[in-house]
Design a protein with these regions (language model features):
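Conserved GNAT acetyl-CoA-binding A-motif
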Residues: 109-119
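Conserved beta-strand-loop-alpha-helix junction that forms the acyl-donor binding cleft
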Residues: 117-128, 144-149
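A short beta-loop-alpha structural element at the N-terminal edge
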Residues: 1-14
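Acetyl-CoA-dependent GNAT
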Residues: 8, 16-89, 110, 142-143, ...
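Conserved acetyl-CoA pyrophosphate-binding loop and the N-cap/start of the following alpha-helix
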Residues: 90, 94-103
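Conserved active-site alpha-helix within GNAT-family acetyltransferase domains
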Residues: 97, 122-140
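Short hydrophobic/aromatic beta-strand or adjacent loop that forms the aromatic wall/cage
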Residues: 41, 147-152
């Protein structure tokens, strides 16, 4: 997989993505402000081995959920907050593990990341199962915009 700074073309595509219920909270609005965030340098596009754009990763504060920030859950040194999204047509097709592991490997190399943290809606059992299978551990649960989220953390084994 190829992971690279998100291009404007990829950002435009992401900004049209809509997901079916109950995953629609991950849908994009198409607003100009969203484009500005997608192109602020913290987002990375991911293409499969055929060169097709399949999803994105973001690292840092943009991967944090507002309710978790309000609850002061994002402290700590050396923790890389991680967000990701896969093209809606590709979700639930068994590609998530390879996709997400590619993002972890990229952040490890690019940022020397050792500890990863993500926020996931608790109803999203597909994602929670994937993250647990990779080695993420469940952390605190919090509310954000009326929905329940969970922090999960993963410490990369030393080489």
């Amino acid at each position: 997989m190829d992971i690279h700074k998100l291009t404007e073309e990829e950002a435009n595509e992401i900004n049209t993505w809509t997901y079916e219920e109950p995953y629609n909270l991950y849908s994009f609005s198409g607003e100009k402000e969203v484009m500005e965030e997608l192109l602020d340098g913290t987002y990375y596009g991911c293409c499969d081995d055929q060169g097709d754009f399949i999803g994105y990763f973001c690292f840092g504060a943009n991967a944090q959920v507002p309710g978790g920030r309000d609850a002061h859950l994002y402290g700590g040194e050396g923790v890389t907050d991680t967000g990701l999204g896969m093209k809606p047509a590709l979700t639930g097709k068994g590609m998530g593990k390879e996709f997400f592991q590619a993002g972890i490997a990229f952040a490890t190399k690019e940022f020397n990341a050792k500890m990863f943290r993500l926020s996931v809606a608790t109803f999203n059992t597909r994602a929670v199962t994937l993250y647990k299978n990779i080695g993420f551990k469940q952390g605190p649960i919090f509310l954000s915009r009326g929905r329940e989220f969970m922090l999960m953390e993963y410490e990369r084994p030393s080489a």
